[in-house]
């Protein structure tokens, strides 16, 4: 379940972690849609609908609940914490468990084969790509964790460097990342991470203007539903793992993320 840390705490009672029901609901729904979306063929209208928001929504919701550090010391602590929480488990599962599993399942038990398997897995984690392309292997599901780690790192760094121009800078970074992804995949899924920065920013802005959004919940939902439905019908969607992002419609996937999440928020 999703929780946010309350800022105030007293000596007699520590700060409590408060649940946000609509975010828990949104994340649970997106998890189901991840499974459903990967069972549908390309070009399917339902697949376009799911991919129009389900992965960006995860980052959007992360930005909503995240609290960016306001000091360099806090930034360093956050990077260490995220690395331990997101990257270390991947290294343990993919690079250790998978290597040993593939080695013992193979007929070749030589050290040379063990080295080849370990080297291949190391290459997949170096690129951390969700899809293979031009000799770059796919690491599968862990691409999401690498994109989240580096996306949060860049997002928090930009918050320290540009505290007053957050939205504009995030938008520029997103455009740059989307463009690079069409030309050349970057190691560690960094081109996707730059796109993720915008979704994190949108989630933060959503939280900051919560009172206003509460007043116009239904009109907001209807206003976002129209372009969202039109783009889905036209087959315009975003698939971060395969860098399926159009520079022409790069702003629309950002609306998708907000739309998909706010739809659940509006009806909650």
Predicted stretch roles:
Residues 2-268:
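Alpha-helical transmembrane segments and their immediate juxtamembrane cytosolic regions
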């Amino acid at each position: 379940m999703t929780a946010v840390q309350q800022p105030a705490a007293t000596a007699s009672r520590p700060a409590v972690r408060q649940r946000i029901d609509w975010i828990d609901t949104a994340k649970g729904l997106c998890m189901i849609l991840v499974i459903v979306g990967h069972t549908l063929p390309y070009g399917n209208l339902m697949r376009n609908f799911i991919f129009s928001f389900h992965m960006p929504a995860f980052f959007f919701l992360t930005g909503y609940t995240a609290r960016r550090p306001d000091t360099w010391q806090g930034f360093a602590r956050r990077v260490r914490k995220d690395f331990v929480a997101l990257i270390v488990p991947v290294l343990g599962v993919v690079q250790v468990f998978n290597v040993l599993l593939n080695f013992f399942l193979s007929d070749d038990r030589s050290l040379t084969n063990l080295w080849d398997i370990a080297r291949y897995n190391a290459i997949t984690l170096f690129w951390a790509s969700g899809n293979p392309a031009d000799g770059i292997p796919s690491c599968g599901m862990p691409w999401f964790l690498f994109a989240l780690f580096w996306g949060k790192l860049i997002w928090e760094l930009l918050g320290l460097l540009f505290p007053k121009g957050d939205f504009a800078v995030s938008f520029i970074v997103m455009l740059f990342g989307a463009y690079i992804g069409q030309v050349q995949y970057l190691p560690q899924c960094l081109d996707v991470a730059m796109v993720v920065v915008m979704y994190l920013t949108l989630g933060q802005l959503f939280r900051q203007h919560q009172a206003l959004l509460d007043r116009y919940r239904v009109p907001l939902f209807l206003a976002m539903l129209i372009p969202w439905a039109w783009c889905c019908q036209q087959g315009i969607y975003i698939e971060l793992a395969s860098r399926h992002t159009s520079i022409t419609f790069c702003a629309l996937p950002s609306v998708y993320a907000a739309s998909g999440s706010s739809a659940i928020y509006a009806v909650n």
